[in-house]
Regions:
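A short, flexible beta-alpha/helix-coil linker loop
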Residues: 29-30, 103, 200-203
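A short, conserved beta-to-alpha structural element at the edge of catalytic cores
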Residues: 189-209
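A short, structure-level motif marking secondary-structure boundaries and short turns
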Residues: 33, 166-168, 201-204
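Cofactor-binding active-site loop characterized by glycine-rich and histidine/acidic residues
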Residues: 56-59, 63-189, 207-214, 218-225
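Structural beta-strand/beta-sheet cores of well-ordered domains, especially the beta-sheet scaffolds
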Residues: 19, 94, 191-193, 200, ...
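A structural signal for isolated positions on well-ordered beta-strands in alpha/beta enzyme cores
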Residues: 22, 166, 194-195
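N-terminal amphipathic, basic-rich helices that act as targeting or association modules
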Residues: 1-96, 100
């Protein structure tokens, strides 16, 4: 009779214990001074202004959508810090491949505001980006941008470019097949890609607890060999 093997006993313990890296508490207090970024007062003020701008953009876009004046809009409420903080670290040479909820990053990366609204209304010019703007239009298919980001990153590597490709998805996107394909190939080819999961706890109406048994979504990168 075959003996049962406890797979968990064969895995390294740290694969199952990802400690949360935290700089600020929910109340805004510093909990780890060693991780504080070296930012000037002016840079901190700019980041705060960007987040307030994103909240106002969300509120006005939501109002336009409910009035029937804006065709498609995915709310960004509550994700200002993750969206604007991550895009603030990028260079103009870096490529961003957004999902449909990542319009604020596109605008802060250099997309003219009216282009974002043309895209939301389904106008063809909303996908006509300037030649020197390193980004792609928002991906409507959840998680599909992960495969595309891997391809762009691999192209940057092959061409010797000092740049990265960045993409975002939610916790629901991390359950999609394209997500796994993207991180698998990126790990195999060591592509300069940054995969950002914005875990708000829900995939439309499906809670995080029903999407994955993994204690943390970061663990999904272990099998792909991504740090």
């Amino acid at each position: 009779m075959a003996k049962k093997v406890k797979i968990e006993d064969l895995l390294r313990p740290d694969n199952f214990n990802f400690d949360m890296v935290q700089v600020l508490s929910p109340e805004g207090k510093v909990v780890n001074k060693d991780l504080l970024p070296d930012l000037s007062d002016e840079e901190l003020v700019q980041l705060m202004e960007d987040m307030v701008w994103s909240r106002i953009l969300h509120e006005r876009s939501t109002a336009l959508n409910r009035q029937g004046r804006l065709g498609f809009y995915a709310p960004t409420f509550g994700q200002e810090a993750s969206q604007l903080g991550s895009v603030a670290a990028l260079k103009p040479e870096d490529y961003i491949l957004p999902g449909y909820r990542d319009v604020p990053q596109l605008i802060k990366h250099g997309l003219p505001l009216h282009k974002a609204f043309l895209w939301s209304r389904g106008h063809v010019e909303g996908n006509n980006y300037p030649a020197d703007f390193n980004a792609y239009p928002p991906q409507i298919i959840i998680g599909a941008q992960y495969v595309q980001a891997m391809g762009v990153a691999l192209g940057l590597k092959k061409n010797g470019k000092d740049a990265v490709a960045v993409t975002w998805t939610g916790d629901g996107g991390s359950s999609q097949g394209d997500f796994y394909e993207g991180i698998n190939f990126a790990g195999a080819y060591k592509a300069p890609a940054i995969f950002f999961i914005q875990n708000n706890g829900w995939a439309i109406s499906t809670p995080r607890s029903l999407q994955s048994a993994a204690p943390t979504l970061a663990q999904k990168a272990v099998a792909a060999g991504i740090p």
